[in-house]
Structures are given as structure tokens and as C-alpha cells.
Amino acid sequence: MATRPGPLTEWPWHRLGNFKYVVMAPVVAHGARRVMRNGWGDLDIAFSLILPSLLLRMIHNQIWISLSRYQTARSKHRIVDRGIEFDQVDRERGWDDQILFNGLVFYAGYLAMPSVRRMPVWRTDGAVVTALVHTGPVEFLYYWFHRALHHHFLYSRYHSHHHASIVTEPITSVIHPFAEHVVYFILFAIPILSTIYLGNVSAMGIVGYIAYIDFMNNMGHCNFELVPEWIFQIFPPLKYLIYTPSFHSLHHTQFRTNYSLFMPFYDYIYNTMDKSSDELYESSLKGTEETPDLVHLTHMTNLQSAYHLRIGIASIASKPYSDSAWYMWTLWPLAWLSMVLAWIYGSSAFVVERIKLNKMKMQTWAIPRYNFQYGLTWEREPINDLIEKAILDADMKGVKVISLGLLNQAKQLNGNGELFRQKYPKLGVRIVDGSGLATAVVLKSIPSDAKKVFLRTGTSKIARAIAIALCDRGVQVIMNEKEVYHMLKSQIPENRASYLKLSSDNVPQLWIVHNIDDNEQKMAPKGTIFIPISQFPLKKLRKDCTYMSTPAMRIPEEMKNIHSCENWLPRRVMSAWHIAGILHALEGWNMHECGDEMMDIEKSWSAAIRHGFLPLTKA
């Protein structure tokens, strides 16, 4: 929103929210009526292209979003090295509004101008006219309109909304108040109306021109330099006809320079080109290699989780993951396709996120596999190979710590990472499974006045540590798993072993659990508090019970470039396993935390609090 919003700031369908696509219902109804009356042959090319062209534009923009986020996380060609936060993602989530607006206006034009219904697929002379009119009137008028928008009166009421994003993403290009988009559409309609008037309009000419506008808009705001220098060396005048991402980035950081639409020609003429444009272009193209201090290794969970990655769909990634959202079901075909492609071609981990905490740099890498694949016996070796390759890559780059998230540290897969430590005893990178901090978070979430807890956690080292700590605290730990009970009993000091009890009666209302099925949840007494020790949340089956979060903490304000949620966790909340790796790097701890090794629980907790991480709940 602009600093002082003026008239026509909001889109007409703003209050419809996610149901805004209903505004295209007249177009769908029109097409359906014609098909039912006269068959598919009654649809001319002009009408047939309206809806498909809108869909293609959305796909085009999404490709740019994913590409930009991937490149800015890993590439040395990043232009503005600052973070993006959730407020920017929320502000820019309506990037498809202008596509719907264009669709409605094109439909209105189709109804108002019968001559366009007979236009051919392609006219070369029409394409030439479009190019000439854009280069002349459109670029000229846009330049001066843009300069007018930077006058205080219009800037504070309209254009400041766009400039709220100093670090740009491709979709920043279309984040403007509705009134601005009306003017932009009029400008971009000039070449199209010119070809209609001259009689050389064509379907592909219109679609191609809109695609050109989208491409240049997205490229100019992608925040990484990709235009090769050899293009300008072969044809030097091109620097006046095509801007670069670094050229337009200066407009967002300096505000009073580089006003041109796509062609810097007018900035050269009117002396508004930023003097550092060439220098920034060259430095961005050259780039600077950087090595993260920490790499957190994650993976996709279910099929739809690919959209929840930071490089997926921005608005979905900015919210805690939920597979119950109705619109997610429409993406199932693409989800299946992405899974198959990842399974076949996913030969290494890929970068999905880049985070900074003061001077420390962190990256998140994803193994291109899904939850169900980790449970397949024949997939264990290939998955371990992928994890091993990621560890060795991190080691070769000089990364200090690599933390294993989700199932990448599964005991049945690699013994909580012990497999890699044994295989490569001279590793420079420290392998961290985060068990010490995860244990601390669980223990700190248990009320201090608790006298009894029910433990249903299996035999993991986190479960052992929790049982030992609770018995040492004088808390009665009740279990109903005989084999697990005897295993834990042997590891608890004799003077505290009496606090561990095998019983199925008088189960308390405080349950510490790993993975329990529906039947076990139904057995819990009313008012039970479930505290999970797993990285995966429990299914919330009971409305009369309380479900605590998986072990996690709130991150400090100093942590930047956080604009996506970690799986199902709320905004600016991070799993204990991820935080453990950060602490390992910050503190310079030299030990591996994998296999049976575990960081001291109190030491991990104290370090987390000292560095600004906060508990989600107070015991």
C-alpha cells in the first residue's frame, strides 16, 4: 500500500480474495454457450486465445519467480545483497491481478471490435509496426509518466507502493495500484490498436507483444545479472535498446535515476542514467563467490510440498504447510510430474534458501526425494549417496557445519549420520543431527510442576535422553512398551530407576510421543497434552486435547531473508534440528553430533537463548 493511498488504489475484486478468478466467469460462459450451440468450430482464434494466454502468462511469471529465487540463493551474480521479508511477499501476492484485468479488457475489446475476430495467426508487417510504435511513443510516454509518478504528490499516493520493495523479485514488476495499471494498459494498447487500425493485427503479434512485456518486466526485477557482456560487444547500440537487471535495480535503490521502461535510450537523452550503471553491471556479472558457514539438509515431504519450498509458489511458501487447502488439489498433476522428474533426474541436492544472521551465512539444500521414498528399502542406498554427496560438496566448499533435517538423519537410513562420520573420519565439516537441542526444547515445554508423564516414543536417542532427564528430575515416567521399557531401565541410574514405570493404567494427561496411530490417540484421556519429539507433526484427531508444536523455537530479529515457512511451522519459527546446526557454527563447536553422540542438553539450550532464539511455549 502507498504511504498515502489515493483513489483507485485497490483492485475492484480485492474483497473476493482467492475467489477473484470468478471475474472471468463471463468469458467462460460465453465460450461454453457458443460451443453448446454451434460446436468447437464456432470459436475463432481471437476468442480461443483469451483464457489460454492468461494461463501461459501465469506459468511464465511463475517460472521467473522460481528461477530468481533459486539464483539469488546460490548465484554469485546477485545484485542487491539484502533480504526479503514476509511483508513483501504479502504485498506482492496479488501479482496475477493485472493478468485478470488484461483478460477482462481483451474480452471487452473482442466484443467491441468485431474486426479482430477475423485476424490471422501472424502478420510480419504488424509485428514491425508493433516494434516501432513501442520503441517510439510507448517508451517515450512511459518515461515521462514514470518521472511524474516520482513527484511527491503521485509518489506518496500511488508509486510508493511499488518502491516499497527495494530488493526486487520478478513479480515486483507488476505490483502497482490499480490506477497505475489502467495507465500502463492504455500505453501498451497503443501498438495493438495501431495494428488494428492499419489492418495488420495478428493473434501471435498480440500474444508475442504481451509475452515480451512480461519477459522484460520479469528480467528487470529478477535481482541477478544474466545479460551476457558479449551481446553488447557484438552490437554496441543494443545497450540503448535493452536494459539489464542491474540497470533497473539502481532505480529501486537510488529512486531518481534509470526511469526507462525497457530501453535506456531515454535516460541517456534526458541525462537521468545512473552514473554507476555500467560499474554495477560489470561487478554483478563478475560476481563474488561466497561460502556458507552452515548448510541445512532437508527434503520434500509429500507430493504437494514442492510448491511449499521457497523456490516454489511464493504465497504458499510464506504460510505453514497444509495439504487441506482446496486449491492445492488442482496442482496434483504438476506435483506428480515434478516427483517423477526429481526421481529420474535428481542427482544432487539443490539450494532452496539463503539466510543471514549478522555475519553468518547459511543455506538450505534439498535432497530431491520425498517422504515415501525414504521408506523404500531399495531407495536407501541411492538416498544415502545423495546425502553423502551433499556432505562432501559442503566439505569441499569449506562449510563449517551441515545439519541433517527430517529423514536425512533417520536411524534406519544412516544411523543418525554416523554412517558418514565412520566412512570419512577426516571430514572438516561437522555433521549435526540436532538431538541435543531437540531434547532440550521438549524438556523445557514440560510444565515444571508435572509429576507424571506418559512416554510413547520408541528407542531413539532423544527418547532415551528425555526419559533419563525426567527421572533425574523426579518425574514419574510411565510406559506401556515392554521392550522399550527394559531397554531404558538399563540406562537409568539405580537411584532413579524407580521413577520409570511399566503400566497401562492411570495414564496421565501429559503425553510425550513420537509417532502414534489414531487408536492410541483415542485411548488418551480427555484434556491430554501431546508433546511430540518427532520432526513431523501429529495428526490432530482429538478436539478435546492439546497438540504442541514439534520441537522448534522462534528465531531472532537479526536473522534476515526469512520469507518462507519451514514446512508446517509458523512464520519466523525454525525447527530445533535446524537451529542446532546454527548454534554449532556460531559457537565453533568441534564435535560431530551424530550416531550416539549428543550435545549437552543445557549447553545447547543456553546457547540458543544467548543467541536470541526463544521458546514457543513457557513451561
UniProtKB/Swiss-Prot annotation:
InterPro entries in the record: CER1-like_C, Fatty_acid_hydroxylase, Sterol_Desaturase_Related
Membrane topology type: Multi-pass membrane protein
Catalyzed reaction equations: a long-chain fatty aldehyde + 2 NADPH + O2 + H(+) = a long-chain alkane + formate + 2 NADP(+) + H2O
GO MF terms, alphabetically ordered: aldehyde oxygenase (deformylating) activity; iron ion binding; oxidoreductase activity
Domain Fatty acid hydroxylase: 138-272
GO terms of biological process kind: lipid biosynthetic process; response to abscisic acid; response to cold
EC number: 4.1.99.5
Transmembrane segments annotated in the record for this chain: 45-65, 94-114, 126-146, 178-198, 325-345
Alphabetized UniProt keyword annotations: Endoplasmic reticulum, Lyase, Membrane, NADP, Transmembrane, Transmembrane helix
Coiled coil: none
GO cellular component, one term: endoplasmic reticulum membrane
Top-rank taxon: Eukaryota
Compartments (UniProt record): Endoplasmic reticulum membrane
Top enzyme category: lyase
Subunit structure of this chain's protein: Homodimer.
Family assignment from sequence similarity: Belongs to the sterol desaturase family.
Biological role: Aldehyde decarbonylase involved in the conversion of aldehydes to alkanes. Core component of a very-long-chain alkane synthesis complex.
Protein's name according to its UniProt entry: Very-long-chain aldehyde decarbonylase GL1-4
Gene: GL1-4
